[in-house]
Amino acid sequence: MDEILSWGGPDATLQPEEIRSALAEILAHYGTGSRVLAVPPDFTRFYSYAGQITAMLQQLLGDRLTDVLPALGTHVAVTDRERETMFPGVPASLFRVHDWRTDLVTLGEVPRELIRELSENKLDWPWPAQVNRLVAEGGHDLILSIGQVVPHEVVGMANHAKNLLVGTGGRDGINRSHFLGAVYGMERIMGRADNPVRAVLNYAAENFLAELPIVYVLTVIGADDHGELAVRGLFAGRGLECFYRAAELALEVNFTMVEEAPEHVVAWLDPEEFHSTWLGNKAIYRSRMMIADGGRLTVLAPGVGTFGEDPGIDRLIRRYGYRGTPATLAAVESDPEMAEDLSAAAHLIHGSSEGRFEIRYAAGGLSRDEVESVGFTALDMSDTYTRYHLDTLTDGWNMLPSGERIYYISRPALGLWAQADRFRDEYPRST
């Protein structure tokens, strides 16, 4: 049976010294050998506390920590500034860059029959279980997969095997997992620890990762009474159970259920963290189950200056926009470039309200024409900032001087919000 090491709870605030002590216990329990690989997330998961954990591990392990491989997926590499900010004190010489095009080993395939069943007969292909060559063939005695369990639009609850199979995976695996989640339905997945995408990852973890010396180190992060982020939980284990324990706490900490569906939600995107709609549309994903039919979502995004994280995806977003599921599926059928980039197709589906509510974007680095060309309503950044008195807003319900009542979200990537009638747990746990 998988033994779980865990600390914290829904009201806990784990201090750095407690976390360092817990990490020392994890290393003592599982053993380190002489070669350890750490796989943390990249800067887009800055608030996961994984950077500080990696720094603590480097202090505890010394020369035994031989490699740090940020789980980039298809994101751009971590810059020197991002690395120094997120991983304080960790030598630059330890960092490796995942290239999802070339640095891959295929460990096996999830059979097409299972994909067909999980997708309700919408998809008919196998799923390749791929990881970075350093994970599969690096000769490490211990692989520490580090990250935050938090509600997620593709996989329901982020992390565990996703960190390796998607974060250090290849194009086909990333594209197909995203597209599976999109065709099954994002609102049927978000916040649920079990769903078709997680079932695929669990199958791959149990059948293809089990022989690797992987230990998952998982955090749960929540806001304290003063709105500051706190580490609520820390979990470690080799199998699936540590993920389910963390997901249970994350649902308690990161999920907000509202009885009344807001007519207007305003979300802020930190300009240091969000530079594209590819990442910034988490404001849409995480709030969509809360917004009233015919309502509005206003996204304040001063740092957003592009759509995609790479030129190819940016081009597809500009070509097709966020027009809803039928239009996107038609593009997949008619355009070979879109058919080859199913993660872009999934992103376009996720980023549409399907006509249910209006999405208004105040993007600091995109023109009005650019914003409106993809199907959003464009707003002026400075006017919007002033209109909504951003300096005075608190998370949750606010009454503006104009008399308008809005719901404000300052960190959409760290939670999930839903109106009670829109959240139903319908998928059985995979084992």
Region annotations inferred by a language model:
Residues 1-18:
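N-terminal amphipathic/basic leader segments beginning at the initiator methionine
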Residues 13-20, 354-431:
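Extended hydrophobic packing segments that form well-structured cores
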Residues 22-37, 61-62, 137-139, 255-264, ...:
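Glycine-rich phosphate/diphosphate-binding loops that line cofactor/substrate pockets in enzymes
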Residues 35-46, 69-73, 145, 265-268:
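Short glycine-rich or small-residue beta-strand-to-loop segments that form or flank ligand, phosphate
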Residues 45-64, 280-291:
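Histidine-anchored nucleotide/phosphate-binding helix
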Residues 67-116, 321-340:
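Long, charge-dense
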Residues 96-97, 101-261, 289:
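Conserved, well-structured core segments that form the ligand-binding/active-site neighborhood
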Residues 274-368:
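C-terminal catalytic subdomain
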